[in-house]
Amino acid sequence: MISDITDKIIPEIQEWQKRKLESVYPIVFIDATHFHVRDNGQIVKKAAYVVLGIDKDGMKKVSTITIGKNESAKYWMTVLNEFKNHGVQDILVLCADGLTGLKDAISAIYPKAEYQRCIVHQIRNSLKYVPYTDRKELANDLKTVYKASTEELRYTNLLELEEKWKHKYPGAIQSWIDNWDVLSVFFKFSAEIRKIMYTTNAIESLNSTYKRINRNRNVFPTDMSLLKVLYLSTLKAEKKWSRMVDKWDLCLSQFRIMYEGRI
């Protein structure tokens, strides 16, 4: 049976989960993909949280995959503590969607790390419930915020955006106002670093691989059966990541100036 064959990789997965990680990661991404898993006789929706790091050599690697039901500060403290126990002493910038409790957990475990909420997800969430007739115009107005050349211009454009759209789509606009502190970290960096943080191609392509798994299988019998498939898919995806991030030497020199003594 296929399950008997894949069971042979369980020790390999366990070793992978215990391996030593880099001491410092300039950029870390956390993202989630949801799957249906059987748990105590019931089918429940669980998230596979993927932590992907870009190391000092500019190489992308999946650091950990954890499967859980509930996001909370306590949950994320467990995940980040595990990260620290595997040797990660410092993270310069951590990019993620608005995962519940993550911001507080980062402050507790990696207090020097800067938390950047994912711009791509923020844009998607803002446009999700906007009718097609307004979507293009609002998307263009959002660009004036996240592509503005100066901090002053960005905030001015944000206020203009709020004034124009707040009555028609209050939820979409209020999210930018409420989360500006974790959306605006992005803007302190050069165009080269912002491109890495903005596009998140590595984790997006990885998630598209995971979503294909979802289409091919409706329900996983156990957490381990899900983890086995994710692990094998991750190994396959990582084989394509043979090159360093574009313009990494330039990015690294900027990180060393901005975070002197930490990298």
Regions found by a protein language model. Give the residues of each.
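Conserved beta-strand -> loop -> alpha-helix junction used to position metal-binding or nucleic-acid-contacting
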Residues: 1-5, 93-100, 105-141
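Conserved, well-ordered core segments of regulatory domains
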Residues: 1-40, 93-95, 116-125, 152, ...
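Amphipathic alpha-helical transducer elements in NTP-driven molecular machines
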Residues: 2-3, 45, 73-77, 96-103, ...
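A broad, structural surface signal
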Residues: 3-14, 74-81, 85, 100, ...
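RNase H-like nuclease fold core
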Residues: 8-96, 100, 104, 109-112, ...
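Flexible, active-site-adjacent loop/turn segments at secondary-structure boundaries
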Residues: 19, 35, 42, 52, ...
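Active-site-proximal flexible loops/turns
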Residues: 38, 104, 128, 208-211
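Acidic/histidine-rich catalytic cores and adjacent linkers
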Residues: 111, 144-263
